[in-house]
């Protein structure tokens, strides 16, 4: 039947970046997104969801860059904000769907710098999230602002959703999600929050 709200926008779900395509543990997100487009998904969406996380890499960095900042998660395009967006854009163009904008529905940079445990000790990234030790709170702020600048420069990028505001209210330091939060455990504002608060539109 007809849609309940013809003005509602339909945004495709964003595949998680994997960098793995072994057919058992994961399907590479680029392969999956390409298959979505090959199946005709572009005909039914107003925007394509994408999760261009930068891990600990600056938003302008690329996997092909020989000088890496991050000590890990730096050997595949899926670890780079700009590479992920460029790869998804290329897939849209190749599918003849270049009019479909990319919507970064989740992105950000995590760091445990400035986060304290209940005992007042510096929190450290949990196992598997050691890359967050490569960024401090100021880099989190600078990278976030630059990512928004890039999104505005690229006319094929739609609305961008930064993740997350305050998982620190729900989770403890044993969870990697709190590293992305713009608020600390005591609700004080991290530099990224303040930078966005005072950013020119």
Model-identified regions with their sequence ranges:
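Noncatalytic carbohydrate-binding groove/subsite architecture in carbohydrate-active enzymes
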Residues: 1-134
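Aromatic-rich peripheral "rim/lid" segments of glycoside hydrolase catalytic domains that contact
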Residues: 118-201
């Amino acid at each position: 039947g007809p849609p309940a709200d013809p003005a509602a926008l339909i945004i495709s779900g964003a595949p998680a970046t994997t960098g793995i395509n072994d057919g058992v543990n994961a399907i590479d997100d680029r392969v999956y997104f390409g298959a979505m487009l090959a199946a005709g998904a572009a005909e039914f969406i107003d925007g394509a969801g994408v999760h261009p996380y930068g891990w600990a890499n600056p938003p302008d960095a690329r996997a092909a860059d020989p000088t890496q900042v991050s000590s890990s998660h730096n050997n595949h395009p899926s670890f780079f904000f700009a590479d992920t967006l460029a790869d998804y854009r290329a897939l849209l163009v190749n599918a003849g769907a270049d009019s479909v904008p990319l919507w970064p529905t989740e992105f950000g940079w995590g760091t445990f710098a400035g986060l304290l445990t209940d005992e007042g000790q510096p929190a450290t990234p949990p196992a598997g999230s050691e890359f967050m030790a490569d960024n401090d709170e100021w880099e989190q702020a600078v990278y976030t602002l630059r990512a928004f600048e890039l999104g505005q420069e690229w006319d094929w990028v739609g609305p961008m959703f930064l993740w997350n505001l305050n998982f620190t209210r729900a989770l403890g330091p044993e969870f990697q999600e709190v590293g992305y939060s713009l608020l600390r455990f005591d609700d004080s504002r991290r530099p990224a929050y303040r930078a966005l608060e005072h950013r020119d539109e």
